[in-house]
Regions:
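A conserved ligand/cofactor-binding region detector
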Residues: 1-304
Length: 304
């Protein structure tokens, strides 16, 4: 109930009239089944005041960013922005914690004095012998994190956005960051036509944006246009996300994004033990990545 309440209050603060309209429709239906949870949503001094709070923040931030310009000079696809320099030490401390009676501060002092060889031994023992990607290390891996800035096509973003154990934020969908050209388009020699259509859509986006605003203009942007977003997740989630999203049946674009994340964890962060233990991250390339998955799905449908 509270989740719906919060969602409706945020929807009521949205700049798009369509979103606010659906908020009212949802409220009407939800009050038929959980009325007691939604008493405050449209009270002037409660829910409506809360929605105004969200709306005021959005408007103020929109004004502020205009002071700094709105064009980006970088087109880097994946950038590792932030990570723990001493991630492996933190993870070792957390790995030992539940097996001892010592305080965390005492364990920190112990780990700081260990040789690199001993640290590696403890980490490998904690990670264990992973026989498949579902064998993920324990909660000590949640002690450290990575933060990435990503520029990818909107379709890939929508797939990666589905992961919940992370902090993810994104910018407005636009035509300002270019677009991707699917490999199949190049293979059938349709690239010129593709680019022509995308450029025309880009011009239409600008026309709509100047007339109705950028929030409305987002509706016409195809999934192949790029969007910028940030993803921050802990090391344990990195095992799950990167190994799952680089599987052979994944889409080539989000596979590439996740492969680059893994490379940056290894080479930029220098977390060699952690990166190498993500042994089900697949850096291979495949033709018709999803064909086997589609064949398997077709077989299942045929059996019904």
């Amino acid at each position: 109930g509270q989740a719906y309440e919060n969602m409706i209050m945020k929807m009521n603060s949205h700049p798009l009239a369509e979103v606010r309209s659906y908020s009212n429709l949802m409220l009407s239906e939800l009050r038929k089944v959980i009325p007691s949870f939604l008493k405050r949503v449209d009270l002037p001094d409660r829910g409506l005041l809360w929605s105004k709070y969200f709306s005021d923040i959005n408007q103020n931030m929109e004004k502020i960013v205009n002071d700094y310009g709105n064009n980006s000079s970088t087109n880097l696809e994946v950038d590792l922005i932030e990570w723990d320099q001493n991630a492996e030490d933190k993870i070792i401390v957390s790995a030992l914690y539940s097996y001892t009676n010592k305080s965390e501060r005492e364990l920190i002092k112990i780990v700081q004095k260990l040789s690199q060889k001993e640290k590696e031994r403890i980490l490998y023992k904690y990670i264990g012998d992973r026989n498949n990607r579902r064998h993920k290390p324990g909660r000590a891996m949640e002690r450290s994190y990575y933060r990435f800035d990503i520029l990818s096509d909107f379709g890939s973003f929508r797939d990666l956005q589905r992961h919940r154990m992370m902090t993810i934020d994104w910018q407005k969908l636009s035509t300002f960051n270019g677009f991707s050209i699917p490999q199949v388009i190049e293979e059938i020699n349709y690239q010129d036509t593709w680019e022509k259509i995308m450029i025309e859509i880009g011009e239409y986006f600008k026309t709509l944006g100047s007339k109705y605003g950028l929030h409305v203009a987002q509706y016409v942007v195809p999934f192949s246009y790029n969007i910028r977003y940030s993803m921050q997740f802990n090391v344990r989630e990195a095992y799950h996300l990167l190994e799952l999203r680089t599987a052979p049946q994944g889409h080539v674009d989000y596979r590439r994004v996740c492969q680059k994340m893994h490379e940056l964890i290894l080479n930029k962060a220098g977390h060699k033990i952690l990166a190498n233990s993500m042994k089900y991250v697949d850096h291979n390339t495949y033709d018709l990545e999803r064909i086997e998955a589609e064949r398997a799905a077709e077989k299942r449908r045929a059996k019904k």
